[in-house]
């Protein structure tokens, strides 16, 4: 059975959503990142980058949420766009846009606003600006069509959902007013029964919630290892 290594963070939840939507049997394996589970040798043997999510499917190992969604979509044939070169090009382009842009800029905006030991105006402005810019591109896309790729719900929408459902946390209260079409899609996805099942995974394991010194050391090693 496929093993799914996860935490309650946005990127693992994208994969949890696919697994629950698809009905693919899987074994959830919690990785408590605030306790440092991601740095244990048995986990870095699966993902040398010490991040979640990852999956092990027989003799196949895949890490990074975007790669996992592509793998699972191709494996099952579910939640994929039409089998045309045009649709394939759009799928890959928007998956990479989300993986390399929406996700990282959202994460860094949250980090510098909420977790950095000092408020650095330049860093906050840069990452919040870039997060806004990326969501603006998505908004323009969704103003013209119902879903990110084609006229059906695909893994691209799941990939977007992971971070986009947290827009008020990323960009601040009132941010939804700027992105009504993004909100429309996220509200539609949130209403799907699979979302409730995916979210329930977080309650199956009592993940550490305290952001104490142990958590900081486990999640943000640069705070304790000066290299520049």
Predicted regions and their residues:
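GST-like domain detector, emphasizing the conserved glutathione-binding G-site
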Residues: 1-129, 139, 216, 226-228
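Acidic/histidine-enriched, glycine/proline-rich intrinsically disordered or flexible terminal extensions
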Residues: 202-228
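Short, solvent-exposed turn/loop segments enriched in Gly/Ser/Thr/Pro and often Arg
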Residues: 32, 155, 202-204
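Active-site-flanking alpha-helical
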Residues: 73, 163-164, 199
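Phosphate-coordinating loops and pocket residues in cytosolic domains that bind phosphorylated ligands
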Residues: 45, 191, 200
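GST-like fold's C-terminal all-alpha helical module
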Residues: 86, 94, 98-193, 228
């Amino acid at each position: 059975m496929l093993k799914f290594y996860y935490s309650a963070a946005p990127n693992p939840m994208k994969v949890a959503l696919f697994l629950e939507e698809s009905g693919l049997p899987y074994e959830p394996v919690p990785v408590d990142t605030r306790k440092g589970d991601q740095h244990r040798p048995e986990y870095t043997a699966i993902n040398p980058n010490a991040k979640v999510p990852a999956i092990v499917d027989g003799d196949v190992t895949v890490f990074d949420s975007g790669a996992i969604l592509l793998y699972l979509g191709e494996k099952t044939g579910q939640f994929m766009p039409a089998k045309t070169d045009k649709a394939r090009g759009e799928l890959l382009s928007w998956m990479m846009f989300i993986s390399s842009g929406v996700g990282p800029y959202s994460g860094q905006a949250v980090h510098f606003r909420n977790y950095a030991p000092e408020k650095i105006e330049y860093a906050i402005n840069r990452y919040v600006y870039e997060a806004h810019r990326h969501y603006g591109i998505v908004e323009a896309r969704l103003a013209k069509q119902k879903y990110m790729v084609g006229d059906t719900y695909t893994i691209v929408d799941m990939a977007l959902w992971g971070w986009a459902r947290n827009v008020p946390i990323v960009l601040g209260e009132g941010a939804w007013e700027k992105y009504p079409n993004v909100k429309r899609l996220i509200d539609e996805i949130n209403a799907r029964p699979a979302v409730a099942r995916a979210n329930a995974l977080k309650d199956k394991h009592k993940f550490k919630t305290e952001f104490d010194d142990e958590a900081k050391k486990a999640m943000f090693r640069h705070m304790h290892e000066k290299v520049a």
